[in-house]
């Protein structure tokens, strides 16, 4: 399976966590946290990272509701992602990000750090989890139904 230089984005109201992976899809790391100001600033910050890393794909966490529906935050994320894709001329794909921020916070606590002191660390870790989930999904064998007759 070919991999791409991809960025994982955890888009929130105040911050955007950014993660990257190598072209082989082996390693994922949190890169930075962008403090949101306005759309143009968000695009400029993400564009600089995308150009530096020669990104070909944006993997965006979509915060589905626990019942699987798209709530207001998910719809805002989709609107932002569509505009970002157009501005950067990069394709996007979505990953179900339910509970990634919670999981990221638990991981930070597990190493003895205080998540409340560095919210940006949670955003970066959540972005890394989003990107890792996408990479894992690319590795899964596709099942197109039964081969038995």
Curated annotation (Swiss-Prot):
GO molecular function: nuclease activity
Keyword Nuclease: yes
InterPro entries with a match to the protein in the record: RNaseH-like_sf (IPR012337), YqgF (IPR005227), YqgF/RNaseH-like_dom (IPR006641), YqgF/RNaseH-like_dom_sf (IPR037027)
EC number: 3.1.-.-
Keywords linked to the UniProt accession: Cytoplasm, Hydrolase, Nuclease, Ribosome biogenesis
Record-annotated membrane-spanning stretches: none
Subcellular location: Cytoplasm
Gene3D superfamilies, per database record: YqgF/RNase H-like domain (3.30.420.140)
Any one cellular-component term (Gene Ontology): cytosol
GO biological process, one term: rRNA 5'-end processing
Cystine residue pairs: none
Predominant location: cytoplasm
Function: Could be a nuclease involved in processing of the 5'-end of pre-16S rRNA.
Record's protein name: Putative pre-16S rRNA nuclease
Organism: Synechococcus sp. (strain ATCC 27144 / PCC 6301 / SAUG 1402/1) (Anacystis nidulans)
């Amino acid at each position: 399976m070919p991999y791409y230089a991809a960025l994982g984005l955890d888009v929130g109201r105040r911050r955007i966590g950014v993660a990257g992976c190598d072209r082989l899809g082996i390693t994922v790391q949190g890169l930075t946290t962008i403090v949101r100001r306005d759309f143009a600033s968000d695009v400029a910050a993400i564009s600089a990272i995308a150009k530096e890393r020669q990104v070909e794909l944006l993997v965006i966490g979509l915060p589905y509701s626990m019942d699987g529906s798209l709530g207001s935050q998910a719809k805002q994320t989709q609107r932002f992602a569509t505009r970002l894709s157009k501005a950067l001329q990069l394709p996007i794909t979505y990953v179900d990000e339910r509970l990634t921020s919670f999981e990221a916070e638990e991981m930070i606590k597990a190493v003895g750090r205080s998540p409340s002191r560095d919210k940006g660390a949670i955003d970066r870790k959540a972005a890394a989890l989003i990107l890792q989930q996408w990479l894992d999904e690319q590795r899964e064998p596709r099942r197109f139904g039964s081969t038995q007759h």
